[in-house]
Amino acid sequence: MIIITAKENVPTNQKLDTCKNQSTVHQKVNKSLGNSNKVLRSNAVQSDKANREPRRITKSVKKKENNTISAVKKVITTESRIEGESKNGNSRKNTRKFENIKKTP
């Protein structure tokens, strides 16, 4: 009867093998760090410029702000109308409608 034993693939010099692996890992890490440093530098430059020059508000930014303000105003006016107050101060019409609703059981 023949017994076959399988040996694990163990490298002759383990230190060299780990060094190789480490060097590739370090290279990858350095590459990623290099990229992040570039990004950080560009951000730093941009923030520096922002500190020096006053921020220019473009038309698009103003439009967006106005749109949000008008949307908020619309919400407020609709809520006040539901409560029985109108924009022009003519609250009679609205309150009459609500009185009728309240009277019905």
UniProtKB/Swiss-Prot annotation:
It comes from the Eukaryota. Residues 96-105 have a biased composition (Basic and acidic residues). Residues 80-105 are annotated as: Disordered. This is Uncharacterized protein C26F1.11.
